[in-house]
Amino acid sequence: MALKISPLSPQNIQELPPLSGVRIATAEAGIRDKGRTDLLFIVFDAPTSVAGVFTRSKCPSASVDHCRASLSHGVARGVVVNSGNANAFTGRKGKQTADAILHAAASALKVKENEIFIASTGVIGEPLEASSIVNLLPSMAETAEEGNWLEAARAIMTTDTFPKLATRKFYCGGKTVTINGIAKGAGMIAPDMATMLSFVVSDAAISSDILQSMLSEAVQGSFNSITVDSDTSTSDTLMMFATGKVKGNFPCFTSKSDPCYEVFSRQLSALLHELALQVVCDGEGARHLIEVCVTGATTENAAKTIALSIANSPLVKTAIAGEDANWGRVVMAVGKAGVEVDRDLLTIWFGEHRLAINGERDPDYHEEAISAYMRGKHITIRVDIGLGSGKATVWSCDLTKEYVMINGDYRS
């Protein structure tokens, strides 16, 4: 089915700046939909530092298995990504397909297979024909060029309605450093130590172990704090690469005590947060972005558990879709979270409108006053538990009939 662009999409989607030493090619492999690019090949001209976080699903794809195993090598020379087929739950044939893609990519670049990383997204459980990808890789390796980030983001889309890109340019170590990132995701979004698919590249010089440390920290407040439908994918992959090709003499930083560590980490966190919000704003059928802020919990973990319980509640999400400030459903979601709360201490706001205080409806609450707020595209739900100092914020989207239509029609 044809998908309308999300009403929450960015107004302007622009190309990202080229990065020295990074070349990109896309192609039409015809994996699922004809007449669109669905294959991405990112080429690094020199050995490049690599880090990654992946799904914790017990049914991971063959691509995830390979990336996990190769990460310890600490060097990347290429990334192959296909959309339309997840190559997950495909048994021995899935492993053979992954191996064939790895061999073809490594041969095209004349590098080792454990220096190639792969990712697949799309339908689960259907065999992926390797030849449709393998035959294209040699020419893609030759024609790959700097830039092309927008095309790269388009090539990895499935039910996404817009490509997701972000960039940061900043001073670090006396040099201008750039970070580019792309992502895809609209459904099956509830990451656990990872994201849907996202690839981030910087021209900074950073050792793989430090890159891994920064990525693992930055993902917590971004991709690990979003949810569309509470379903964690079999293919969730977030990978980051550092080429060290920044102009000028930029020494590789290899320690958390390096002055650049904090600066770079802050910029990386901001970029991942921007990409994560784009994913939520493209949640299948979404019309409202929902921000859930929980304070006063016994611990930060408890606060996040409560926040996710609210953000994942179908009843809360459908109430937002109906522009109904149904705070009773928020109370329900808090109560079922399974962590310590006191019903008689709860305070709930929608935006700046306080709806409930000390365990009952606010006597000053008036339905008419909040109606205009509920028609906005960004709805903030704040809950104070009243027990401690733990706090957390997560982001979600509403649940509309379009979500059911998109997923009911996905394999048609």
Swiss-Prot record:
GO cellular component, one term: cytoplasm
Keywords: Acyltransferase, Amino-acid biosynthesis, Arginine biosynthesis, Autocatalytic cleavage, Cytoplasm, Multifunctional enzyme, Transferase
Catalytic activity, reaction form: N(2)-acetyl-L-ornithine + L-glutamate = N-acetyl-L-glutamate + L-ornithine; L-glutamate + acetyl-CoA = N-acetyl-L-glutamate + CoA + H(+)
Record localization: Cytoplasm
UniProt: substrate binding residues: T158, K184, T195, E284, N407, S412
GO molecular function, one term: L-glutamate N-acetyltransferase activity
Site (Cleavage): A194, T195
GO biological process, one term: L-arginine biosynthetic process
Coiled-coil regions, chain positions: none
Site note Involved in the stabilization of negative charge on the oxyanion by the formation of the oxyanion hole, residues: T121, G122
Residue positions of the active site: T195 (nucleophile)
Name of one Pfam family that matches: ArgJ
Listed EC numbers: 2.3.1.35, 2.3.1.1
Chief subcellular location: cytoplasm
Pathway noted in the entry: Amino-acid biosynthesis; L-arginine biosynthesis; L-ornithine and N-acetyl-L-glutamate from L-glutamate and N(2)-acetyl-L-ornithine (cyclic): step 1/1; Amino-acid biosynthesis; L-arginine biosynthesis; N(2)-acetyl-L-ornithine from L-glutamate: step 1/4
Function of the protein: Catalyzes two activities which are involved in the cyclic version of arginine biosynthesis: the synthesis of N-acetylglutamate from glutamate and acetyl-CoA as the acetyl donor, and of ornithine by transacetylation between N(2)-acetylornithine and glutamate.
Protein family according to the UniProt entry: Belongs to the ArgJ family.
PANTHER family referenced in this protein's UniProt entry, alphabetically: ARGININE BIOSYNTHESIS BIFUNCTIONAL PROTEIN ARGJ (PTHR23100), ARGININE BIOSYNTHESIS BIFUNCTIONAL PROTEIN ARGJ, MITOCHONDRIAL (PTHR23100:SF0)
Quaternary assembly: Heterotetramer of two alpha and two beta chains.
Protein name as annotated: Arginine biosynthesis bifunctional protein ArgJ
Species annotation: Bartonella quintana (strain Toulouse) (Rochalimaea quintana)
